[in-house]
Amino acid sequence: MRILHTADWHLGKTLEGRSRLSEQADVLDELNTIVKDEQIDAIVMAGDAFDTVNPPALAEQLFYESLSALSDRGKRPIVVIAGNHDNPDRLSAASPLTHENGIHLIGYPTTEPIHIEVPSAGELLAVGALAYPSEARLNEVLSDTFDEKLLRDHYDVKIRQAFEHMTSRFRTDAVKIAASHIYVAGGNQTDSERPIEVGGAYTVAAESLPADAAYVALGHLHRPQTIKRARTLARYSGSPLAYSFSEAGYAKSVTIVDAKPGEEATWQEVLLSSGKPLVKWKAANGLSEVYSWLDEGRDQNAWIDLEIRVADQLSLEEIHRLRKAHPGFIHIRPVFEEQNKDRERIEVKHVSIEDRFKKFYEKQTGGAVPDEEMVKLFLELASGVEEEDAK
């Protein structure tokens, strides 16, 4: 059986007010081409179909039209679970209609697996589909303590038990996979993922992923990656488009899994080419360098984060001229020469870890200042790492 694993479509998401819907339509068309060319038997979409709990109508229309096409009008089974960005009630509202066409929309976490006949493979697919499992969606208070470590431990145990319960009910003659929208400890994050829980309370250990599944399809992290410490093959497929400039330069892909009942699964990554790339320009030589790049036709079909070294503040006229020359400029961020000289004078070893974090945060966010609570949380985490290293 060939299974395509995708996640984190974030339909309706914008980039600083710019619509990405046409790019999202293009990448879903590309997925449809892939499932045909690769003879995919079933699809698992591991959460965050939408970017908000109240997505625009055009995003919902694109979602249902794409599912219809990807399912080949009901011939190819699809399982979609809700992520932390999705409204679980809204996502599953159409289930009575979609279920008849082999499309399973799962809004809330459940401990019962689903078994699906896959006609093209002539095999049975068992899916332990655990939609985003927050306390609210589990309808359960996991702990009455405010101790972060205890909360994390209780949550980890709850997720491990949910997986174990589901996988224990898998039929032995089925291809067995699990799917969830969670943060697994050690995964590489980007700026475009909304934190599942401040402080990391909703973190799952890699070892808590189910060993009895041939494959675990994960959603939430936007960078494709394999979970190394898991007891079975487990991957984040990543998002099909880059949604923040922290993802600039990273390839986007989907994962194809080949599995048979009772055997280990294998996988391959299929790169995606749709959508505009997100790129960073650093113009150390000022406006003249930027216009030189524009004359060369550099990154014509891209969204651009521009950092430009200048002696004085850019005028509104200069900013307008740049945006007219290339409509893809998202950020135009001046860096003043005096600031650069000051930076060169400061040696990192003389800067406190708090100030280094603040400077890093400002750089990553384009000038935003972290609030007191975030700085406090970072210092607590950093202190914990130092204590562990000292042991």
Curated annotation (Swiss-Prot):
Keywords for this protein: Coiled coil, DNA recombination, Exonuclease, Hydrolase, Nuclease
Organism superkingdom: Bacteria
InterPro entries: Calcineurin-like_PHP_ApaH, DNA_Repair-Maintenance_Comp, Metallo-depent_PP-like, Mre11_N, SbcD, SbcD_C, SbcD_nuclease
GO molecular function: 3'-5' exonuclease activity; DNA binding; DNA exonuclease activity; endonuclease activity
GO BP of this protein: DNA recombination; DNA repair
Subunit relationships: Heterodimer of SbcC and SbcD.
Alphabetized PANTHER family for the sequence: COMPONENT OF ATP-DEPENDENT DSDNA EXONUCLEASE, NUCLEASE SBCCD SUBUNIT D
Annotated function: SbcCD cleaves DNA hairpin structures. These structures can inhibit DNA replication and are intermediates in certain DNA recombination reactions. The complex acts as a 3'->5' double strand exonuclease that can open hairpins. It also has a 5' single-strand endonuclease activity.
Annotated family: Belongs to the SbcD family.
Listed name of the protein: Nuclease SbcCD subunit D
Organism: Bacillus subtilis (strain 168)
Gene that encodes it: sbcD
